Amino acid sequence: MAVVTMRELLESGVHFGHQTRRWNPKMKRFIFTERNGIYIIDLLQSLSYIDRAYEFVKETVAHGGSIMFVGTKKQAQEAIAEQATRVGMPYVNQRWLGGMLTNFSTVYKRLQRLKELELIDFEDVAASGLTKKELLVLSREKAKLEKTLGGIREMQKVPSAVWIVDTKKEHIAVGEARKLHIPVVAILDTNCDPDEVDYKIPGNDDAIRSVTLLTRVIADAVAEGLIARSGAATGDSKPGEKAAGEPLAEWERDLLEGDKKDETAAAAEVQTSAETEKVADAEKPAEAVAEAEAEAPAADADAEQA
């Protein structure tokens, strides 16, 4: 079954590129035609590239990796936060801080600082042992850290790969990922440079519906990878598959527990029906013996009368 259909891509406007005067010649091979001064992206190529990116993300997560979702433009902020939160992955949908990947040790210290500030009760001035002014300063510091680092609060190390919406706007993130040899999965509009991206998806990175659809596809790949990872951890996987390296998201645990309950109920039902059949089979010979014994005296009485 296809990850996404051609109809969904068309309805979301994934095929619309930029104006013909705003393009990168390296994207020529992904362009189908031009209409009214707008480039039209070849969706047949997009479909094959989506499948390739989907498999990469799924395998990366299944082997214990993590995917960072990055998109700070207004059209992408909501979709990035929603889909990354759904699958329990880190995300950046506000300003990208320089060094977020290449200088992660310093960023990690700021994350620890954020967690310290979250322990303070800003409503109870007396119990905090601080003045109102000091609490106000700390409250502002906490709000600033939450805005810039809230999406990566639980991140313990640099991600295994990054999903990026608009590589031109997020050129700093792309540069840091390439410097650390972290694979980049991204939407490529007609004004982007395909050489910067490892797993490219030719498409529209400006329309909200297009960005939402493609980000959801990547999140679905993450979800499938998490399920495969949990199967490896419980020993249900095929030989050669890697075990889980990171905890599952809460929604994944609920899903798996529900599946296990269904399997247990089905097994119990099969066992009960098998036991019922055995009892029935055991009762049949006993009934036959009883009938034979009842018929024997009747036959003897008939013989005596004769």
Swiss-Prot record:
Basic and acidic residues bias locations: 275-286
Q: Which PROSITE patterns match?
A: RIBOSOMAL_S2_1 (PS00962)
Q: Which residues cross the membrane?
A: none
Q: Where is this region: Disordered?
A: 257-306
User: Which superkingdom, per the lineage?
Assistant: Bacteria
Is the keyword Disulfide bond assigned to this protein? Answer: no
What Gene Ontology cellular-component terms does the record carry? cytosolic small ribosomal subunit
Which processes are annotated in GO (biological process)?
translation
Q: Entry's InterPro entries?
A: Ribosomal_uS2 (IPR001865), Ribosomal_uS2_bac/mit/plastid (IPR005706), Ribosomal_uS2_CS (IPR018130), Ribosomal_uS2_flav_dom_sf (IPR023591)
> Where along the chain is composition biased (Low complexity)?
287-300
Report disulfide bridges, numbered on this chain: none
Q: Which CDD domains match?
A: RPS2
Q: Which UniProt keywords apply?
A: Ribonucleoprotein, Ribosomal protein
Query: What GO MF terms are annotated?
Result: structural constituent of ribosome
Entry's PANTHER family? 30S RIBOSOMAL PROTEIN S2 PROKARYOTIC AND ORGANELLAR, SMALL RIBOSOMAL SUBUNIT PROTEIN US2M
Q: Which family does it belong to?
A: Belongs to the universal ribosomal protein uS2 family.
Q: What is this protein called?
A: Small ribosomal subunit protein uS2
Naturally occurring in which organism (per UniProt) = Streptomyces griseus subsp. griseus (strain JCM 4626 / CBS 651.72 / NBRC 13350 / KCC S-0626 / ISP 5235)
